[in-house]
């Protein structure tokens, strides 16, 4: 590597580290720090770590583009589209890398969902329900849109051997253990993780075939059944588990790990660029 390129890389690394310090400063659980902002910090890190590669960030993908990708796999796929300008827009956007053939390939897709304010309400002494006489609010269905986005990205990446979709869950509807919360008047309210009223994790684990959560499932799983081989594209689902907010530095580290796994999975298609001295 030339001295000029080395200098540029060090400058980029410094810029990236400044960004990390800025976003993960005093309040790592700030409501203002979105998964989209974290994605852009991940992008900066990747650009610094792999200066030979070209990356880009997109906020959305058009349904038309997804259909065109499907048609390349099989002409019978991707035929139906009623709204020409429809698109999907994951919370954290899409990071892509340009491969040795000049094609853009997905490195990371991230989303974060908060559902269930029972912990916050109990701590504040707020009662809920029609008559404002209940401690717990029945879980809603706000996370259903995640299923659509996961399916659309799975279609878009049907020809790939990796699926870097990461979904961060927080709030009382995604508990992994029973917790006890004390109200201002001293009364203790127990939130049971296996309550059908509260927990909505099972509605999302269909997107990873019931495999473990809080696990990097970026590399596709190939299973054999009788004479058939089936490829599984599983979302990597991470739940905070105690009804609290995610630490953004933790999110960043998970997203970076999944991005690196994607690049490793595409290694042979990036080899020429990675081994160049530009």
What would you call each of these model-derived segments?
Residues 121-216:
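Acidic, metal/cofactor-coordinating or nucleic-acid-engaging core segments within structured domains
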Residues 110-117, 167-171:
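Short loop/turn segments at strand-loop or loop-helix junctions that form parts
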Residues 25-32, 36-68:
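N-terminal, Lys/Arg-enriched amphipathic/low-complexity engagement segments
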Residues 1-32, 42-48, 178-278:
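C-terminal tail/extension regions appended to the core domain(s) of diverse proteins
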Residues 59-104:
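Active-site metal-binding core of divalent-cation-utilizing nuclease and nuclease-like domains
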Residues 48-52, 98-102, 154-161:
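Secondary-structure boundary elements
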Residues 103-106, 119-123:
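Short, conserved acidic/polar surface loops in the N-terminal third of protein domains
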Residues 92-94, 106-114, 146:
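Conserved catalytic cores of phosphodiester-cleaving nucleases, focusing on short active-site segments
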């Amino acid at each position: 590597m030339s001295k000029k390129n080395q200098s540029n890389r060090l400058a980029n690394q410094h810029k990236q580290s400044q960004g990390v310090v800025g976003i993960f400063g005093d309040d790592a659980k700030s409501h203002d720090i979105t998964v989209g902002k974290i994605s852009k910090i991940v992008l900066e890190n990747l650009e610094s770590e792999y200066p030979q590669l070209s990356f880009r960030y997109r906020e959305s993908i058009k349904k038309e583009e997804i259909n065109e990708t499907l048609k390349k796999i099989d002409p019978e796929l991707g035929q139906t589209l009623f709204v020409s300008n429809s698109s999907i827009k994951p919370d954290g956007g899409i990071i892509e890398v340009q491969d040795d053939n000049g094609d853009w390939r997905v490195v990371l897709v991230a989303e974060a969902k908060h559902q269930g304010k029972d912990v916050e309400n109990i701590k504040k002494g707020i009662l809920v329900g029609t008559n404002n006489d209940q401690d717990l609010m029945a879980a809603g269905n706000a996370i259903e849109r995640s299923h659509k986005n996961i399916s659309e990205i799975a279609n878009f990446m049907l020809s790939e051997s990796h699926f870097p979709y990461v979904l961060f869950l927080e709030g009382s509807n995604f508990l992994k253990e029973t917790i006890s919360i004390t109200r201002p008047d001293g009364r203790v309210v127990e939130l049971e993780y296996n309550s059908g009223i509260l927990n909505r994790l099972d509605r999302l684990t269909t997107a990873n075939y019931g495999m473990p959560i809080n696990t990097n499932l970026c590399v596709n799983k190939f299973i054999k059944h009788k004479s058939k081989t089936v490829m599984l594209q599983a979302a990597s689902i991470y739940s905070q588990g105690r009804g609290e907010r995610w630490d953004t530095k933790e999110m960043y580290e998970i997203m970076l790990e999944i991005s690196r796994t994607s690049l490793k999975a595409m290694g042979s298609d990036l080899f020429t660029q990675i081994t160049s001295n530009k």
